[in-house]
Amino acid sequence: MSLADSVLAVNNDLPIRTNSPVHSGKVRSVYWLTDADSRRLIQTKGYNVPEDTPLAIMVISDRISAFDCIFHGEGGLKGIPGKGAALNAISNHWFKLFAENGLADSHILDIPHPFVWIVQKARPIKVEAICRQYITGSMWRAYSKGERVFCGITLPEGLEKDQKLPDLLITPSTKGILTGIPGVPAQDDVNISRADIEANYQAFGFEKVEDIDLYEKLLKDGFKVISKALADLDQVFVDTKFEFGYVTDKNGNSKLIYMDEVGTPDSSRIWDGAAYRDGKILENSKEGFRQFLLNHFPDPDILLNKDRMPEREALARDNALPLEAMMNVSRTYTGIAEKVTGAAIPLPANPKADIIKILREEYDLIV
């Protein structure tokens, strides 16, 4: 098996029994199970959900996206070795820690394979729940140009790049394109304020206006749990994005849960603590890959300018990145995952074959 064979790049072609189209995201693909299979698994596996809950198989890939494009490497390498397993392992660890700290549940019911989650269907909140402890990235770029109000929050004068903020900030943005909301442009990833959410809470998917307080509490509490655990590993939790949704419990009550992934190198910035104390930034997240791309290509404006999207897509499609750059990303992801979980990240030689075997023999889901 070659290195390229060990990478799961295409994850939407598994022969999983489903009666609806596979939903393919940038990194994960979702297979909605039939009603019969959902009910059977809930009964035979003892999942703590109502028997009519729709279930899905969520399969992560090793693809890497940046600046809204998928990149690839030399030698037919269509992803980052170990990336998918690392992301899932980190999220699994944090979700377990959340439960131990009395926070909300997640959508995950079962983990058949390092690349696979069995999840319950949730009603998503249409908000990217972003939390920031340091001023860096897009916030710093805007601040350095004179902007002081972010998502309805006014920042003080005199802040410096990469410094710790006086308070933990919640700076939400829209999840997907939302139409008909006063003052909110119909564009993806638009910054919004708490006042925007309160005035239009149902349009953003909240069932009760009081749940806005709950989502902010779960966001801050989750951030603090991860931040403390990372600090014990001499890592700095800089900022992150969470997602939330509603599910119905066995008593028929609606409850807010964590969705997607949490505290990963894809959804967060994580800095090395020792380097930060020395005045340097050593990224243990995808931000390092973004910085590599900005330095690698002669015209970085293509990656930053949304008006040049066709050029950006061509750049990603037509340029194979150096193998060493791809392996550097692999080492970043597997390294931080092993720090967080305390265990080695499995790198199966043929992950697709392994997934099919498990889902056939242990779950009877392969056609």
UniProtKB/Swiss-Prot annotation:
GO terms for molecular function: ATP binding; phosphoribosylaminoimidazolesuccinocarboxamide synthase activity. The lineage of its organism: Bacteria, Pseudomonadati, Pseudomonadota, Gammaproteobacteria, Alteromonadales. GO terms for biological process: 'de novo' IMP biosynthetic process. Belongs to the SAICAR synthetase family. This is Phosphoribosylaminoimidazole-succinocarboxamide synthase. CDD domains: SAICAR_synt_Sc. HAMAP family: SAICAR_synth. It comes from the Bacteria. InterPro entries: SAICAR_synt/ADE2_N, SAICAR_synthase_Vibrio-typ, SAICAR_synthetase_CS. It comes from Shewanella sp. (strain ANA-3). Keywords: ATP-binding, Ligase, Nucleotide-binding, Purine biosynthesis. It catalyses: 5-amino-1-(5-phospho-D-ribosyl)imidazole-4-carboxylate + L-aspartate + ATP = (2S)-2-[5-amino-1-(5-phospho-beta-D-ribosyl)imidazole-4-carboxamido]succinate + ADP + phosphate + 2 H(+). It is an enzyme of class 6 (ligase). SUPFAM superfamilies: SAICAR synthase-like. Pfam families: SAICAR_synt (PF01259). Pathway: Purine metabolism; IMP biosynthesis via de novo pathway; 5-amino-1-(5-phospho-D-ribosyl)imidazole-4-carboxamide from 5-amino-1-(5-phospho-D-ribosyl)imidazole-4-carboxylate: step 1/2. Its EC number is 6.3.2.6. One of its GO terms (cellular component) is cytoplasm.
